[in-house]
Amino acid sequence: MENILCFLNSYTETGLSPDSHCLDIDLNFICLSGLGLFILYLFYMVLTLYSSPTEKNNDTQKHQGRARRKRKSVTFKDRKSLQKEAEEERKLHSFLKSFGPPVSCSPLGQHHDTTLFRRLLCPDPVCRVCNRATADIQRLLSWESLKDAAPSVSPLASSASGAESSFTLASTPSATTPEDLILSSRPKPSPPPPLILSPDLITTLADLFSPSPLRDPLPPQPVSPLDSKFPIDHSPPQQLPFPLLPPHHIERVEPSLQPEASLSLNTIFSFGSTLCQDISQAVNRTDSCARHHGPPTPSALPPEDCTVTQSKSNLTVLKTFPEMLSLGGSGGSSTSAPTTKGIDHSCPASSEFSWWQPHAKDSFSSNFVPSDFMEELLTLHSSEASLGGHSVANIIQPVNISFLSHDIPALLERQVKRRGDFLMWKENGKKPGSFPTQLRPNYQLNSSRNMLTSTAVKHDLAESFPFWASKGKLEWQHIHQQPPYSKCFEDHLEQKYVQLFWGLPSLHSESLHPTVFVQHGRSSMFVFFNGITNTSMSHESPVLPPPQPLFLPSTQPLPLPQTLPRGQSLHLTQVKSLAQPQSPFPALPPSPLFLIRVCGVCFHRPQNEARSLMPSEINHLEWNVLQKVQESVWGLPSVVQKSQEDFCPPAPNPVLVRKSFKVHVPISIIPGDFPLSSEVRKKLEQHIRKRLIQRRWGLPRRIHESLSLLRPQNKISELSVSESIHGPLNISLVEGQRCNVLKKSASSFPRSFHERSSNMLSMENVGNYQGCSQETAPKNHLLHDPETSSEEDLRSNSERDLGTHMMHLSGNDSGVRLGQKQLENALTVHLSKKFEEINEGRMPGTVHSSWHSVKQTICLPEKSHSQIKHRNLAALVSEDHRVDTSQEMSFLSSNKQKMLEAHIKSFHMKPILNLSI
């Protein structure tokens, strides 16, 4: 060990020494070894790429082989188990057949009596375990009978159970369990033992094995065991005393039944009908039953057969429509659905059905159950024959059904409603308007929302009456009507259906047109799902009036029908009471209602009502419209509107006019032309002009305010005009403006006003010269007309007055006092003139100029009286009005000047503000 360590130490020392060549040799070796490793890695990658697909294929083949082996083993085991189960079922079936041979009308749809087996299991009719076992046995028996009858379908496909048979519907596990379908009956006090009735009293077996539609929006609802618990009375069966129908009325059905179908809801009657529906009856010693068709399926699916069983007697009687009218019995309704294919469309005549009518009337009693459910069991289905065009109505009439409990009709009614809901869901899956060729317009449904039937109407006049009843409650009603059109006469086979939106998950329901027939004397009334119409019972098309033109609707609306209280279901008795006064619905008039449809709004109006407005009403409307237009265009004040109402009476009430027929025809007024007299027109124009003046220049109250500030007792104190605003003014400018003011005032005012102003000035004057000067001025004004006076006279008068006034001021102190008084009087007269001018309605063209002249007159220069006298004399002698000197007014104090200045400023700003507003 020590030698090895020494060798390693010596080797490392020699390798690490700088003079040794071992390091160079090791580097070359390292490079070569790395290159070799890289090449090996490349070879490995290439091999993996080529080998991976083959390995994957091998793995998949291995997995597939394992799966096949597993499937083979499972299928082999399943086959064995299925064979064992089939053998057990056959044994059980043969064992159950030994209890009692079935009474069948045809190999298809046999019903076996399991009552004895049920009694052997347990005497207690309420035992759920025994009921479940009985339901399973019944399902097995039904399935076996269907499998045996599938290869060869008999033309007569109907079956019935014995006198004491219990009816049980076989259901699939996906919908409901057999336990929920078994219902027991209460024991009858009579000696015969009680019967056990399954939850579905009468339900078609084709619904059990029919494939679910492709567009079912909702799955079928499970049936609760509490919805169909009822006993049925025990009585011996009756035999139909009439033979079978002719063989050419037998329907041909293709045997295509699928067992993997979901459970359909309960039904009472399923009556298949196309253009003409044929029924095959089978006679048996103990009982008989009628074969019916199941609910409608999409056109791609094959037809289905339904089997109706009963315990007492036949529940259906086929009668023609006219013969049913002659009986006068109470009506009802049932579910009707057409088959899709394989139907013999040869229609029998009405006479072929009449030979067995007496037998039918004798074999069945007329004791109907007086309940709403029995009224719902009768339907009317009217159809046209494809050959010959004869109309034959097939009616299913329930007879002699009696129950021990009064709750049985309500339970059966719930069964009918659930079945109708399922049929409605199946119809909602289809696209609107996609009717198959065999699906005629005579399609009807019986559901919780509509207990109505359909009838082929040969014209397109239909008054609709939609109903929306959820869970047997009528929520709202509305009258709807379709207007007649002439196009329906050309092709009466095409029916226009009213679309009804149900709010279900699908887009909307199929175009439904169900009706219910109400017999009233010789006439009949068809209550549509979406309408009500009165038609005659003759086979000929009724004569319809031509389309009426559309007019304006009446102002009086038609009262809507009253809403029924909640919990009250719509039945045939309520439909019959539509024509009676005491019914909750309004009585329909004998004449058809004409309809105006504007944007989805329906207006109902009787035929005899006025279809257009009267000329007087049109004039009233025009008058009101023109009045509104005038008010909007002119914007007249309330005074003008009041005067207009005095001369133009308002339009009378159209309702009163219609009653009295005495119409006051108003005058048609063109906008801008008022029917006023000349005097009223002048007054109106003057009033409007005054209002315009007031709006433009201010209201008269402003002038009153200015006059109140310039009263004679305090005018001198308020005549303080500051020179800071306009500066000193020359006398010539003042004199010129004064002359212009006097000239304009003399030319625009009447003679009386000038006399009054001159009298005011003459009373204030003192002195002979002054009095003469004041007298000459009014004389000149009186001699000359204000409108024809010349400018020279006015100017001379004004200059003379002003000159005498100035000369008087230069005399002495008394002259100064008199001059001040004259100035005050002149200002007062001027303002009064302007005030009267505005009150008289004249255009105030001189308002601004007069105000400016007054301001200039007041703003006399306050100089010495000698200078004023000298200037006035120089102006009078040389007639040179251009004097550059100025003088302040010494007779006004500073306080008075400030007050006058503030007043002038405010008075000057008010018109400007009014104009800007």
Curated annotation (Swiss-Prot):
Region feature Disordered, mapped onto this chain: 55-80, 152-195, 773-797
Amino acid composition bias (Polar residues), ranges on this chain: 164-177
GO biological process: cell differentiation; spermatogenesis
Disulphide-bonded residues: none
Major subcellular site: membrane
Membrane topology field: Single-pass membrane protein
Regions crossing the membrane: 29-49
Biased composition (Basic and acidic residues): 782-797
Bias (Low complexity) ranges: 152-163
Keyword entries, A-Z: Differentiation, Membrane, Spermatogenesis, Transmembrane, Transmembrane helix
Start-end of Basic residues biased regions: 63-74
Subcellular localization(s) per the UniProt record: Membrane
Entry superkingdom: Eukaryota
InterPro entries in alphabetical order: SPATA31, SPATA31F3-like
Any Pfam family: FAM75
Cellular component per GO, a single term: membrane
UniProt family annotation: Belongs to the SPATA31 family.
Job description of the protein: May play a role in spermatogenesis.
Protein name (Swiss-Prot/TrEMBL): Spermatogenesis-associated protein 31D3
Taxonomic lineage from the root: Eukaryota, Metazoa, Chordata, Craniata, Vertebrata
UniProt gene name: SPATA31D3
